[in-house]
Curated annotation (Swiss-Prot):
Annotated Gene3D superfamilies: Hypothetical protein af1432
Protein name per its UniProtKB record: Deoxyguanosinetriphosphate triphosphohydrolase-like protein
Top-rank taxon: Bacteria
Originating organism: Bartonella quintana (strain Toulouse) (Rochalimaea quintana)
Keyword terms of this UniProt record: Hydrolase
């Protein structure tokens, strides 16, 4: 086949989807690939990055080493990308862009999940704070250093916009009223990411895929850990209906397989709901371009009102019964202590950091030093953070 005849399915997209042929491009000019679309190249660069590999040993609720089968940021990101591609295909969007955003959406997370982020944000309180979405942008535009002609991954405008705004506008009447991290504002002077507008539909697919996958894997991990039981899910509206159907169709099924079946059906039910509701939203709004999507006064890829209530109930149940389980809270507090003590140690004596990091600390202001330490700390895996803690504080690992 002649290279020019490769079919990128450009004609299969809806008129309101992102189109790699009309991409806003990259910050640093690069010639177009003859064998991959710009969004495919973004996806591939993300997969080959150091940040992507480190997701293997970063966790969300359960700490690395507690079990080989608990989700990590890596497995979660792959699951999110699978759901995002399904949604994008159903809505005639660019699957590669949805996948790229999904695969990179957790790049900025610290070791030890949200406990680590809370601790680092507290440590950075006087230096601009810490936000995982802003950190993801720092990683893909600066901290990844793999290419000869630029720092970062030099991703397309559309992928960067999706990373920054997949949860909605950061400025304007539809923003969440939180302060916009300085790193995002500074980068926005180089490439206008339209912070007051909604992201494209591919980013919206990635965002809601994250919610679906998050609920599913927390059910699975909660059952696996025995912190949760199937009986408890009979008290939650959505899972109660699903469990009743499973019992009716497979009365002899053992509880382990019933748990797997519950997770599978929960994902399918939510995905089908999002597709149906999003199609209805599109039919109502009638966008004729990406600009119409970005200027819409609402998120378009959503749950139905009924499913939104069910999803909120499920999330509240998981927060109460899993995230605030005594053993999870104990590990969370230990994780926060580790991150806080590591930050304080590096700040007081930067020379204890690896040479590749402490060599950059000369002549830095206090704020610049704190940000460099945040870059170092947030990039750590759970394993590496534990090893650093043991090295610096000469203690045995009693964490897990």
């Amino acid at each position: 086949m002649h290279i020019s005849k490769i079919n990128f399915n450009y004609q299969a997209r809806a008129i309101y989807s992102a189109n790699p042929q009309t991409s806003r491009g990259r910050l640093f000019y690069e010639t177009m690939s003859t064998i991959r679309s710009p969004f495919q190249r973004d996806r591939d660069r993300i997969i080959h990055s150091n940040a992507f590999r480190r997701l293997k040993h970063k966790t969300q609720v359960f700490i690395a080493d507690e079990s080989d089968h608990y989700r990590t940021r890596l497995t979660h990101s792959i699951e999110v990308s699978q759901i995002a591609r399904t949604l994008a295909r159903a809505l005639c969007l660019d699957e590669d862009l949805a996948e790229a955003i999904a695969l990179a959406h957790d790049f900025g997370h610290t070791p030890f999940g949200h406990a680590g982020e809370d601790a680092l944000n507290e440590a950075m309180a006087h230096y601009g704070g810490f936000d995982h979405n802003a950190q993801a942008l720092r990683i893909v535009t600066k901290l990844e250093q793999r290419y000869a002609n630029f720092d970062g991954l030099n991703l397309t405008w559309e992928t960067l916009e999706g990373l920054v705004k997949h949860n909605g506008p950061l400025l304007g009447p539809y923003a969440n009223n939180k302060d916009v991290p300085i790193d995002i504002l500074q980068y926005n002077t180089k490439q206008d990411l339209k912070l007051n507008c909604f992201a494209g539909l591919e980013a919206q697919c990635a965002a809601i895929a994250d919610d679906i996958a998050y609920n599913a894997h927390d059910i699975d991990d909660g059952l696996r850990s025995q912190f949760l039981t199937l009986g408890q899910f009979e008290q939650v509206s959505l899972t109660a209906v699903l469990l009743k159907d499973i019992e009716k169709e497979h009365p002899q099924l053992d509880k382990t397989r019933r748990g797997y079946e519950l997770v599978r059906r929960q994902i399918t039910t939510m995905v089908e709901d999002v597709i149906k509701q999003s199609q209805e939203n599109l039919a109502h709004i009638k966008p004729t371009s990406i600009s119409d999507v970005q200027q819409a006064e609402q998120t378009i890829v959503t749950f139905s009102p009924t499913m939104a209530v069910y999803e909120k109930e499920l999330k509240n149940f998981l927060f109460k019964n899993l995230y605030y389980h005594d053993q999870v809270l104990s590990r969370r507090n230990a994780a926060k202590c580790i991150v806080q003590k590591l930050f304080d140690c590096y700040y007081k004596n930067p020379n204890v950091m690896p040479e590749s990091w402490h060599s950059k600390t000369a002549h830095l202001t206090n704020q610049e030093l704190a940000r460099l330490i945040a870059d170092f700390l947030s990039g750590m895996t759970d394993h590496y953070a534990l090893r650093e803690y043991q090295r610096l504080f000469d203690c045995t690992n009693n964490f897990v």
